[in-house]
Amino acid sequence: CFAGCAVMNMDRYSGDGLFASYPMGKRASSKHISFTLPEMTADFINAYVTGSLGITGHFIGACATSLYNLNAGVELIKSGKSELVIVGAAEAILGPPAYIGFSAMGAMATDERMTNLQQLLGEGDDLDYTKFCRPFGDNMGMVCGESAGFAILMSDRLALEVGANIRGCFLNVNINADGNKKSISGPGAGNYFSVGKTFKDIETVFGAKTLQEKSCFLAHGTGTPLNRITESHIVSTFAKEFGIENLPVTSVKSKLGHTMGTAGMDQIWCGLGALESQKLTGICTIPKLADDVFKENLDFFLENKEFNSQKDIAFLNSKGFGGNNATSALISSNLTEKLLQRRFTEKELKAWKKKREATLQLREKNFELAVNSDIEPIYEFDKDVLDLTDLEISKKSIKTKTGFDYALNSDLTKSDF
């Protein structure tokens, strides 16, 4: 499992509660540190959900954290070291420390700023908090949100063997730093590299026609004046270079706010929904694009609407403070199945679809249980805890009382060195 957060968890059960306890004359809880540390999102999944003894970790990449963890999972599967990886993020960021910090950076859409903007635009004096986050429109800053999201990645072999409901795939995640900077929080050149490389990945695997006709773009779209200029220029530039005439563009932050480390997972769910329903969520908080937004070869969706043609690729873009740029592309189940046809026989794919029927039935059943609050969350507290007496250790393997047989095989050979 690779999961965590971008900053830290800051609610009263974690960082805020820990730091406020002493000044307020209260005692810190033994859980405060555990809930504060970024990598504990993965640790709690390993300890209380999956019972995993496998590879784990967390990559912090500011606002690109989710895509950093996605990259770790994708590369682990491509290397053959794992066949199933859970990737994701969870961040409790809403609280005074976050607002104070981001406001000091000039990044927040504060009441004062939005009052001035609304008066300037003739929108009246009554603040409309539902329209505080305005990506690519006349805006004054971002809005903090909270979210949690996880995805299960599998090798194609394992997915077919277990009859998985394959909703799409990722080919690659491209990550680039900004190089030399003046302001550490300011944007740089790195996102040009990550976006351009991802466009090239799609063109290489699926061809120019598919890239040009079947793509949409889920922008980072924070709602800051600088982001609307820099990111729109990046997307417009590569849309022109790769011959895309009207690339659909949106930002889910207009509805969810900026969930920090989890922002990339928000984009994944938005992308999945868009490719499955052929409808894209719009930037519904702005009446029009700002004058300084680059629009050439782009089609910004300012309302929820259907695509005018079949889309099978959703680009996901993250621009994080410090120069943490990550871009990937979510491939639809339709194109994913075509990729599987290149690797597996018709008989193997038919067997997978047969197994998938049971998976879909179970999925529908569990969905109904969840909607009706009739399903309990998995919380394996103090179950199958292993100590020294539960391990059978030899030079060749480590066996546990729970049935796990871990072969001590090295990934290295002498020829590597």
Residue ranges and their predicted role:
Residues 1-59, 84, 90-101, 203-233, ...:
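Conserved beta-ketoacyl condensing-enzyme motif
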Residues 2, 74, 78-81, 99, ...:
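Nucleic-acid-interacting cores, centered on viral/eukaryotic replication and modification enzymes
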Residues 81-143, 173-188, 219-228, 245-298:
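Acyl-CoA/ACP chain-elongation machinery
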Residues 62, 182, 256-261, 318-324:
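Glycine-rich phosphate/pyrophosphate-binding beta-alpha loops
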Residues 8-22, 26-72, 105-143, 234-266:
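Conserved catalytic cysteine-centered active-site region
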Residues 113-208, 215-216, 333-394, 398:
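Condensing-enzyme catalytic core mediating Claisen C-C bond formation in acyl metabolism
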Residues 1, 66, 73, 102, ...:
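Conserved small-residue
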Residues 38, 42, 46-49, 57-91, ...:
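Active-site-proximal alpha-helical scaffold in enzymes
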